[in-house]
């Protein structure tokens, strides 16, 4: 038995398959053990390891450098705040699958919840989409011009090249570029108006109100712009409260894609006074991204990511390369649902360089406020209860009704919000009244179009205004086809000359097929003229009610006719928060009728509680440039009005930019750098130097002013005509600002060959304009308009007329050259750039353009004349400077641009007279007379030369005073 067993074993061992069987058995046991270890013993650890899917390197933004004034005062800096960010997390896909919804649905739900948390705790989210909903429920854009066009291009994905587009695609492109705010909203909400295949865009459920949908849309749009950077976060809100932080952290598991972090935001001191110099920052746009990253690789330290903050204007923009901090990076491990679970490497972001300006911020702020007071004083002096403004440019008055309307027309009072959810009872009452006024106006318009036989010129002022509005609206809406109109047509000419009414003209236009009836409710193209006319009037009724500006047009006319009172308008200032009721005695007095609306406006303007910028009447703007005579460094570059750069930089006030962009006072426009004006009589010192150097006059040459210069046709008049100045030398001519004297200089410059040739005279004037720095930009680092030296009529050009046109900063360069006797600088507002350790990176040294070697007696004669402008008995402004303790020299100037508006007021000056330190250039567009500019400059010097105690006292004066009535003299 045992023997048989051994034989079987021996036989089995001799079998070759046994070894393989044993080997496989051992391997199987090892495999089982290994699986046990991996799944049971180390299972949890490997489960975690399994989620480590992607390594990604992302950029982190650097810290922006600071901006300082010449005395080391901080003008722009960074403040560390808590922010809420949103990221297109892959977890939304998981949630959508789990909840059987869509990714968009889940994203919108989270964003809506976060916005509610923020608003519940008093925080404001960033609105990056330039659309707002008014109180009456209408959509409107908050940007205009090129910025609005770019927004539409980004939204619809519109390129600039149209060569490969079909006619249908071109038509769609045109529709998209002309899309209304509501159409853009609907497109972003659900894809309406998109090209084929664009999908649902953000697919925002109809359960959300329009207001909530717009808030969701704003965040989604920001993320959409960063769609090519999967791990890029977009900021929802900056500077959130501790309550919001606590609530968001507590609910973090319910809010995928949401994160709380710290971020530096830009803060500006003295923001309004320095707005046009320092500028502001904002999130980079696609064009800027392309520009700044040109020639760079993504790994470069100075490469810009799509959420970078960049300079948008002023020094912030011009010195972006210095102020911008180099980017850092983080190497991230991202799990299979897109969550960042680990940071493996951090490269610290850099800090930008600091910039020091030549601007004295204290001087800048004082001069800005001074200019505002002086402009307010001019307006105060011209306010009248009369309905007539007069016609004399030097005495044009401002009817108080114009001021009432200006509060509405210039957007200080927002009619669209009278019926908003938070509207007061008084606002709702006024909303109903304005609706009734609209209905009344529409009835008047319908009657005028359908029944009136009167010619335009015999209609009332109100009906004429409505006729003008209707005509422009029809052209704007392309119902009246202006391109089809035969402008030589007799009936059209009768309409233009006011000999027929609008109704008669439109009937004629229908017959001539100048009216596009496709937009009218006309079923039969063979309808007669009256049927089409009725359809046109019906169309107009709806179009006017939908138009943004119809309410304001009606209000203007109803104010003029007394149907809407000044008191009703002024009370809205309190209801809409422009003025505060608390502590304001004027409120109760106005409400009760104890204070009339004229005196109310007068008092508020005097206290600058209502400003010239808000009214937007003539004048409402101005500029002052103060330049160091010895270096060409600018100490103050003031442009009024300015704006609050903190509101623009924060990104939370979407309506503020629209308010600025549509204001008639043009606060976004840098008056000092871009507003070109004829220099007027401030050009006469240049003409004097040209005449002296070319030998057509000497310092002792006398010219007899007879008032009428008849060597040219038509004759040119001296400002004193029909009176005259009599015999004057060059210094006396500058003092008296005698046109006749300088007409003769211009004539003699063109008559050097013995025969008068205007072109020859212009050649010499241009020669000295070039030498004195007026033919080129001033050199200031912020950019400016191109100057223009006159190329027509040397006689009139010699007194600053013709086609001479310069900006205030260019005129400042010119008067600085006059003050220092011939040193022409490139002006500058920059002193230096330093790194974080204070080491100088770049120094902006004084740059001389040229040195003019004119004879001493020529300088003496010109400067003596400018001094006599301040002290002489023949000067129109010398009485302003009586009793001043400082010695200055100056020259007045006025320039006419529009015969229906006041003259521009200019005054150039420098001081002290014998050893000049500074030049001061003052320009007030539509400022009536040069005496207003001279009075402003006088107070600039008063502050500049004052001691500390006197400066402090002057800074406390916050009240405007009526401008004095000064005789014209230039």
Residues of each region from the PLM?
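Membrane-proximal periplasmic segments of bacterial cell-envelope enzymes
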Residues: 1-605, 614-623, 629, 746, ...
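Short, well-structured active-site flanking segments
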Residues: 646-649, 683, 692-712, 822-833
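Second-shell loop/turn segments in exported
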Residues: 53-56, 88-104, 230-238, 263, ...
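Mid-domain, small-residue-enriched loop/turn segments at the edges of structured enzyme/sensor domains
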Residues: 621, 716-722, 756-795
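Conserved catalytic neighborhood of penicillin-recognizing serine enzymes
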Residues: 353-354, 398-446, 450, 668, ...
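Active-site SXXK
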Residues: 34, 72, 111-113, 248, ...
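A short, polar/charged loop-to-alpha-helix boundary motif
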Residues: 84-96, 642-663
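Active-site beta-strand/loop architecture of penicillin-binding DD-peptidases
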Residues: 65-68, 263, 267-269, 275-293, ...
